[in-house]
UniProtKB/Swiss-Prot annotation:
Amino-acid biosynthesis recorded as keyword: yes
Phylogenetic classification of the source organism: Bacteria, Bacillati, Cyanobacteriota, Cyanophyceae, Synechococcales
The protein's enzyme class: lyase
Pathway it works in: Amino-acid biosynthesis; L-tryptophan biosynthesis; L-tryptophan from chorismate: step 4/5
GO BP terms in the entry: L-tryptophan biosynthetic process
GO molecular function: indole-3-glycerol-phosphate synthase activity; phosphoribosylanthranilate isomerase activity
E.C. no: 4.1.1.48
Name the UniProt record assigns to this protein: Indole-3-glycerol phosphate synthase
SUPFAM superfamilies, sorted: Ribulose-phoshate binding barrel
Pfam families, sorted: IGPS (PF00218)
Gene3D superfamilies, A to Z: Aldolase class I
Similarity section: Belongs to the TrpC family.
Gene name linked to the record: trpC
Superkingdom of the organism of origin: Bacteria
Keywords of this entry: Amino-acid biosynthesis, Aromatic amino acid biosynthesis, Decarboxylase, Lyase, Tryptophan biosynthesis
């Protein structure tokens, strides 16, 4: 899947004037490309407010990140759970109107989640880095920053707000970027959850050094359709490489009930990332127990 990082006809500035040349492919081809194009602008604006060097200085004085990978691998409950703090999505709209990130995070922690994922994209998911910081102050669990990362700046921003791990989406990053970002993440003592959806993306990620977590997104980020068969197929085709590399497979999206957990665990998933089906319930703590068939 090819993702264009920018529109083919970017605005051109001449002194105080700005113009744009018409182009037949000037519109994003799908939602993922639209998100990436917006992220380009968003990161540029953030850099103007807080330079990268400031973020790098901030993270130097922070306590070391929590062990995100270890929390998943040492879980007595299988598959391990990454519970997501999520208000909305492009496909579902508002998932929880009375959204309180701290209350939800505390409920997840009380329910036995191993790690948390916090959405930080503002425009499409109504998340924020402020939410990440609030959650960090409220719970003791390792945190994943769920962001569409396309620049190192976002990695440092995530760490400065308390993230212990970040999401890297193979579909929107080149192999060169993935290698570079993995080195930055390792240098910060963080973990990377590298997300794939196709066999081609899986093979690209398996060829990289230092990958400990691979997330299989059961949701097609172009169409937003969901199929748990995605996890089953990819693990079946690359079981040997994943096992030999001691890589923990995380299944993401489309997980609603115990039967889904059992199906994915049988397929080879050692952890799951669950958001919508938990956050939309009145009591997220109780929702975790129900998901694992404990009530």
């Amino acid at each position: 899947m090819e993702i264009r990082r920018r529109p083919p006809n970017p605005p051109i500035k001449v002194d105080i004037l700005q113009y744009q040349i018409k182009h037949p492919e000037a519109a994003p081809r799908h939602i993922l490309e639209e998100i990436v194009w917006h992220k380009e602008k968003e990161v540029a604006q953030r850099r103007e407010l807080v330079p990268l060097v400031k973020l790098q200085s901030l993270v130097k004085d922070m306590t070391p990140p929590l062990d995100f990978v270890g929390a998943l691998r040492q879980s007595p409950r299988q598959p391990a759970l990454i519970a997501e703090v999520k208000k909305a999505s492009p496909s579902k709209g508002i998932i929880r109107a009375d959204f309180d990130p701290v209350a939800i995070a505390k409920a997840y922690e009380a329910g036995g989640a191993n790690c948390l994922s916090v959405l930080t994209d503002e425009k499409f998911f109504q998340g924020s880095f402020e939410n990440l910081q609030l959650v960090r102050s409220a719970v003791q669990l390792p945190l994943l920053c769920k962001e569409f990362i396309i620049y190192p700046y976002q990695i440092y921003l995530a760490r400065s707000r308390g993230a212990d791990a970040v999401l890297l989406i193979a579909a929107i990053l080149s192999d060169k970027d993935l290698r570079y970002f993995l080195k930055i993440i390792e240098g910060l003592g963080m973990a990377a959850l590298v997300e794939v959806h196709t066999l081609e993306e899986m093979d690209r990620v398996l060829a990289l050094d230092g990958v400990q977590l691979i997330g299989v997104n059961n949701r097609n980020l172009q169409t937003f359709t969901v199929d748990l068969q995605t996890t089953e197929d990819l693990f079946a085709q690359r079981r040997e490489q994943l096992t030999q590399g001691d890589i923990t497979l995380v299944s993401e999206s489309g997980i609603y009930e115990l039967a889904d957990l059992q199906r994915l665990q049988q397929a080879g998933a050692r952890a799951v990332l669950v958001g919508e089906s938990l956050v939309k319930q009145p009591d997220p703590q109780q929702a975790i127990a129900a998901l694992y068939g404990e009530v």
